[in-house]
Amino acid sequence: MRAPGAGSASVASLVLLWLLGLPWTWSTAAALGVYVGGGGWRFLRIVCKTARRDLFGLSVLIRVRLELRRHQRARHTIPQIFQAVVQRQPERLALVDAGSGACWTFAQLDAYSNAVANLFRRLGFAPGDVVAIFMEGRPEFVGLWLGLAKAGVEAALLNVNLRREPLAFCLGTSGAKALVFGGELAAAVAEMSGELGKSLVKFCSGDVGPDGVFPDTQLLDPLLKETSTAPLAQPPGKGMDDRLFYIYTSGTTGLPKAAIIVHSRYYRIAAFGHYSYSMQAADVLYDCLPLYHSAGNIMGVGQCLIYGLTVVLRKKFSASRFWDDCVKYNCTVVQYIGEICRYLLKQPVREAEGRHRVRLAVGNGLRPSIWEEFTERFGVRQIGEFYGATECNCSIANMDGKVGSRGFNSRILPHVYPIRLVKVNEDTMELLRDAQGLCIPCQTGEPGLLVGQINQQDPLRRFDGYISESATSKKIAHSVFRKGDSAYLSGDVLVMDELGYMYFRDRSGDTFRWRGENVSTTEVEGVLSRLLGQTDVAVYGVAVPGVEGKACMAAIADPHGRLSPNALYEELQKVLAPYARPIFLRLLPQVDTTGTFKIQKTRLQHEGFDPRQTSDRLFFLDLKQGHYLPLDQGVYTRICSGAFAL
């Protein structure tokens, strides 16, 4: 930030001039001159440009910390905090189901969750037991996990897109004693019924066909109607540091892991979002994200449970209905994630775009290449982009609308929030260390792995990990900031500019080297998607026998078979460096995404450019001819043997 000697020299000159008998005003002016001349002007420039931002960020940090400590001392839980909201505004709308039109007041949500708590207590479920929820996003979903929490029972929130082995895996690792599933997912449960333990108690909620319920399944809704809606006579003795529920990671890099969400983490995520973007109690938030993930269930629904906002739920994102819903329900805040903003831009212009009242869009994953296009077309005044995995302790937020930034860390007071970018081996992603064995901090403009110092006594810095202890240990490094400390490894590469703004580069493993250069998959995906009219694109590196590094491969959604590889190549030559241009193309009906609209690359990377692994159309870039050629088994063999120079 500034030369280490600048400050020392200025202080020394101040003392020397004072000893010589000069007035303090003269001495101070001279010392300031030495400081500025020694490079301190850079620091003063940073102070002038970021002080307002940093003060606001500091106020948010202090406010959240004080609130958390107050709730910790009082041993409050999320259900108890919600109870206070209910008492203030029992008849206000809490949740609205945009699909069915159902509207739940805070009093109704409280009554439903009380019935859930009483029912499971009566059935013998004890604090610390786990119940899995497999249901699409609707008010009952929220009432279920909230009611279980009132009884001290921990919910495992299952991804509704999982089937068979992956679904059985997640259910098994949760240690659940019961499964509550929606009638709309009865067929998925039936598919794996043979893998479910006989001791697992099963409940079905919602509408279900005559063949949808198996003999050992109980209908939940009639049971709840017969159960008292009064608060539990003896609430569990839980606190903010106890487990609330489990959220499974999206599985973009393998099988999902069950992240532990304690009450304080739920509060922290919701509170940071609330204060960072100045949400108000009168706001109406539109939440079309999955409720089995943290963005929809904590950042979104948390505004309802903790701060009393009305939240409009839609079980599945619909680009064509998005703005109509916002107009219908007078939404002022919307959520996005992954590629949602790009999908909205692909839609034809609609009348509702100009009639909505949305002032704020909160989420993560908005590509810098479409940031301003999104705000200008839809008239959304503020983008609340943030960075943070469900389980991480190093979340950051873009509080002042800096285009493309995921958030910031203060350059003036960097130690107030102990996160850091550290150097890693670009090929193996191993941490690089100095002679003292500590991690090496990155300089401004230098990409590095984001890490957060762990302090289990501090709710803002604790890391609760996963159900799997081995998975937890893999995310922790030691002697990072100082000897013997522990830090959370985010797995994501970011870069920080001179003012402390951070920009997302790649998830570890998504940057690869080719021809001695680093290729950023995020950058190439953004370019390709823009050239192709916001089409879904997945970019990844593939190994080629006998060739150093990894070659760039792009999987492109081409459901109608209209894409011309060579017309695309003509455009790529204008905007991408030679080393970043895809060597291989795969044209397929659709690119797989996770439930949170993140591109799913695991299967694509595994299959590579081998035509035996797929029936999709494959092409390779013949550099001699200067265009793409079809890739069949014969060509594949020649490439692997080195007959074709890449």
Curated annotation (Swiss-Prot):
It is a single-pass membrane protein. Inhibited by Triacsin C. One of its GO terms (cellular component) is plasma membrane. It is found in: Cell membrane; Endomembrane system; Cytoplasm. It comes from the Eukaryota. AMP binds at Y246, I247, Y248, T249, S250, G251, T252, T253, G254, L255, P256, K257. Its EC number is 6.2.1.15, 6.2.1.3, 6.2.1.-. InterPro entries: AMP-bd_C, AMP-bd_C_sf, AMP-binding_CS, AMP-dep_synth/lig_dom, ANL_N_sf. The chain crosses the membrane at residues 14-34. Residues 35-646 are cytoplasmic. Keywords: Cell membrane, Cytoplasm, Fatty acid metabolism, Ligase, Lipid metabolism, Lipid transport, Membrane, Nucleotide-binding, Transmembrane, Transmembrane helix, Transport. Residues 1-13 are extracellular. GO terms for biological process: long-chain fatty acid import into cell; long-chain fatty acid metabolic process; medium-chain fatty acid transport; positive regulation of triglyceride biosynthetic process. Residues 191-475 are annotated as: Sufficient for oligomerization. GO terms for molecular function: arachidonate-CoA ligase activity; long-chain fatty acid transmembrane transporter activity; long-chain fatty acid-CoA ligase activity; nucleotide binding; oleoyl-CoA ligase activity; very long-chain fatty acid-CoA ligase activity. It catalyses: a fatty acid(in) = a fatty acid(out); (9Z)-octadecenoate(out) = (9Z)-octadecenoate(in); hexadecanoate(out) = hexadecanoate(in); (5Z,8Z,11Z,14Z)-eicosatetraenoate(out) = (5Z,8Z,11Z,14Z)-eicosatetraenoate(in). Belongs to the ATP-dependent AMP-binding enzyme family. Self-associates. May function as a homodimer. Interacts with EPRS1; mediates the translocation of SLC27A1 from the cytoplasm to the plasma membrane thereby increasing the uptake of long-chain fatty acids. Interacts with DGAT2 and this interaction is enhanced in the presence of ZFYVE1. Mediates the import of long-chain fatty acids (LCFA) into the cell by facilitating their transport at the plasma membrane. Also functions as an acyl-CoA ligase catalyzing the ATP-dependent formation of fatty acyl-CoA using LCFA and very-long-chain fatty acids (VLCFA) as substrates, which prevents fatty acid efflux from cells and might drive more fatty acid uptake. May act directly as a bona fide transporter, or alternatively, in a cytoplasmic or membrane-associated multimeric protein complex to trap and draw fatty acids towards accumulation. This is Long-chain fatty acid transport protein 1. It comes from Bos taurus (Bovine). The lineage of its organism: Eukaryota, Metazoa, Chordata, Craniata, Vertebrata.
